[in-house]
UniProtKB/Swiss-Prot annotation:
Pfam families: Ribosomal_L14e (PF01929). This is Large ribosomal subunit protein eL14. The keyword Ribonucleoprotein applies. PANTHER family: 60S RIBOSOMAL PROTEIN L14 (PTHR11127), LARGE RIBOSOMAL SUBUNIT PROTEIN EL14 (PTHR11127:SF2). GO terms for cellular component: cytosolic large ribosomal subunit. It comes from the Eukaryota. Keywords: Ribonucleoprotein, Ribosomal protein. InterPro entries: Rib_uL2_dom2, Ribosomal_eL14, Ribosomal_eL14_dom, Translation_prot_SH3-like_sf. The keyword rRNA-binding does not apply.
Length: 152
């Protein structure tokens, strides 16, 4: 399996540490093997240098030239609809669900537990019905045994 997310000009990343945690930024320039110049004009992140360890690369990419100014980055961001694509992405939905789970009250966690128990009970019942039906009519072998290997 090959990598699909490379550090490149225009690659959109999510800040995972620091004051801009959770905000999206675009890589404007690569400073060295450890740092990049990033800018997030639509997410209110000022242009600054960030360590790659602070960034999580996404599948999104905006097209703009090397070392582009903030205005150019903003136009490319809006043209490629990066914010809209991010909201529709699997990772963004997963992060939103995790945040929602953090804000649940004790009673809401209890209701969730009961709903999961009811769902699992239904699955168990249906699986039992399938198992019972399979025992009544055993499955036929798909191929005949090899006579050379199984001598009687």
């Amino acid at each position: 399996m090959s990598f699909r997310r490379f550090v490149e000009i225009g690659r959109v990343a999510r800040a995972v540490y620091g004051p801009d945690q959770g905000k999206l930024v675009a890589i404007v320039d690569v400073i060295d093997q450890n740092r990049a110049l990033v800018d997030g004009p639509c997410t209110h992140v000022a242009r600054k240098s960030m360590n790659f360890k602070e960034l999580e690369l996404t599948n999104l990419k905006a097209k703009f030239p090397h070392s582009a100014k903030t205005g150019v980055v903003k136009k490319a961001w809006e043209k490629d609809e990066i914010s809209k694509k991010w909201e529709e992405s699997h990772l963004a939905k997963k992060i939103a669900a995790k945040e929602k789970r953090k804000t649940l009250t004790d009673f809401e966690r209890f209701k969730l537990m009961k709903a999961k128990q009811a769902r699992n009970r239904l699955i168990k019942i249906e699986f039992g019905k399938l198992r019972k039906a399979l025992k009544k009519t055993p499955a036929k072998p798909t191929r005949k045994p090899n006579k050379k290997l199984h001598k009687v």
